[in-house]
């Protein structure tokens, strides 16, 4: 296996890194502007040409109908498509072009083909969104060896420098998503305690607040129709770029000026912070909720706060967190690059564990013995690491199964709860209803209810999202009616989902393939890959 690249597939910007021969994570800058981050914007320029990055972003003001941005907010949803040149593209398709552009820039800069990757996603992403992210990588022709949470990746980047055990809060405010994660860090181990967030809260919301203020002031000064502005896609695309730039300027200046149709509109920092205070408070509320979840596991406090994500450069973020958590050190953790670097380090970590397993097998010892020997000798493992890092994660959502209650009424019962450690296996006791039954219907729903937050942990249908509803087959052969069986729900370290069925009496277990309702099929992935292989990407 060659280099394993770490990719931060962001809502507004993306980044790719690798670990060099000295064990140092290195970000590959893009070809267009030599920046470490690439705008996550896709321009379907023509039927046979797609542009990604800064040039695509510039097309928002000239060709907005053919430009797709912030697609990450839609990933994992089957009903959304972006249409260009008569073809409808699912979020996985669009995301694959961003991944393809990152890989293309690596080839241009390093002369090396990107094959094996670790891709990050928000900690608050559910199973469908994680699966869709993996599918995007497959469409791009990449071997996705792991999906890892963005805050965990940032903690890996930070944690490898930690000399003593610490409990940290990773406050990750990106361009389109927000995560807050409580993590215990010590040499050789990173343990996620609790996570929360909002995948529709990010820097774009602050941009939109500026845009709303600009349009309001413009209408007030000119008397023009507000609807005419909102209906003009070129104007709105132009404002999208200008408002993002104004947000950045307001992080270091007292005011910013935006020109709309020859009219100069001034936005002051005071106005901006007042108009977006509710957004910041929403993130603070999530930190409180996540701290409360961590407290259920005995973690009552944190030693420091790490700021991750480009939107944390807004000074009001650090100010508000200082007020909320007085006397807690607040550090910037390389907001733009730490996630991709952490993902690359995690990839190197996977290689290190494989090397350890090989050493253990050759020496006739277990892996832990080899680890201790490596620590004593100081010998550097592959990728320059002195020891592997064990990452312990949690599931970010709760999962309910549709079952009959004592009155034979179908209800949703939560069996897996948010912030449960993964990997996990959750057996659900059932029984066959007829002799030689070959299948069993299973309906699984994702939700945000925590343990004990509803009576008997029953979840209302309107508060849950259907993940899958299918006949699972084949069950073990020749089961009589009333045979006890277990449906075993499994979630792995990456937050991906599978199901087994077990004959309790006979001890036989059958693994069942699961097709999530919103997930692209292998055939659809292959068709998309073949299509994009014939399209020029730049």
Please tell me what each predicted stretch does.
Residues 1-77, 84-88, 104-538:
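Oxyanion-binding/catalytic loops of NTP- or PPi-dependent enzymes
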């Amino acid at each position: 296996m060659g280099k394993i690249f770490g990719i931060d597939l962001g809502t507004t910007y993306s980044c790719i890194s690798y670990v060099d021969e000295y064990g140092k994570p290195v970000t590959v800058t893009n070809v267009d502007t030599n920046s470490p981050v690439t705008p996550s914007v896709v321009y379907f320029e023509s039927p046979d040409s797609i542009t990604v990055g800064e040039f695509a972003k510039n097309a928002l003001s000239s060709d907005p109908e053919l430009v797709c941005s912030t697609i990450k907010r839609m990933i994992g949803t089957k009903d959304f498509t972006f249409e260009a040149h008569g073809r409808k593209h699912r979020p996985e398709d669009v995301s694959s072009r961003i991944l393809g552009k990152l890989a293309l820039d690596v080839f241009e800069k390093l002369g090396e083909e990107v094959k094996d990757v670790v891709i990050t996603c928000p900690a608050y992403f559910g199973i469908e969104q994680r699966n869709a992210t993996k599918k995007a990588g497959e469409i791009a022709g990449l071997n996705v060896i792991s999906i890892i949470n963005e805050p965990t990746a940032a903690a890996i980047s930070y944690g490898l420098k930690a000399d003593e055990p610490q409990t940290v809060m990773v406050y990750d405010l990106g361009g389109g998503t927000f995560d807050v994660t409580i993590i215990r860090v010590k040499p050789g181990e990173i343990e996620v305690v609790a996570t929360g967030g909002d995948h529709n809260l990010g820097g774009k919301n602050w941009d939109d607040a500026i845009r709303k203020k600009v349009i309001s002031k413009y209408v007030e000064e000119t008397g023009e129709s507000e609807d005419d502005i909102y209906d003009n896609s070129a104007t709105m695309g132009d404002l999208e770029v200008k408002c993002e730039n104004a947000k950045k300027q307001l992080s270091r200046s007292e005011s910013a000026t935006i020109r709309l149709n020859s009219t100069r509109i001034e936005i002051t920092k005071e106005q901006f912070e007042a108009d977006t205070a509710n957004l910041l408070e929403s993130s603070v509320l999530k930190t409180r909720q996540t701290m409360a979840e961590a407290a259920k596991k005995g973690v009552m406090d944190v030693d420091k706060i790490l700021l991750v994500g480009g939107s944390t450069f807004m000074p009001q973020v650090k100010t508000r967190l200082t007020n909320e958590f007085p006397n807690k050190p607040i550090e910037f953790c390389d907001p733009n690059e730490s996630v991709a670097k952490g993902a690359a380090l995690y990839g190197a970590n996977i290689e290190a564990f494989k090397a350890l397993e090989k050493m253990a097998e050759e020496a006739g010892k277990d892996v832990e013995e080899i680890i201790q020997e490596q620590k004593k000798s100081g010998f550097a493992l592959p990728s320059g690491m002195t020891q592997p890092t064990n990452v312990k994660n949690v599931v970010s959502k709760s999962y309910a199964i549709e079952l009959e209650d004592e009155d034979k009424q179908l209800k949703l019962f939560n069996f897996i709860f948010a912030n449960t450690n993964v990997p996990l296996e959750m057996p659900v006791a059932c029984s066959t209803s007829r002799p030689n039954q070959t299948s069993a219907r299973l309906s699984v729903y994702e939700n945000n209810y925590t343990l004990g937050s509803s009576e008997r942990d029953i979840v209302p249908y309107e508060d849950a999202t259907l993940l899958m509803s299918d006949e699972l087959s084949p069950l073990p052969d020749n089961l009589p009616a009333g045979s006890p069986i277990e449906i075993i729900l499994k979630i792995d370290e990456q937050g991906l989902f599978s199901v087994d069925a077990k004959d309790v009496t006979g001890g036989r277990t059958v693994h069942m393939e699961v097709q999530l309702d919103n997930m692209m099929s292998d055939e659809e992935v292959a068709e998309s890959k073949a299509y994009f292989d014939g399209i020029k990407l730049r």
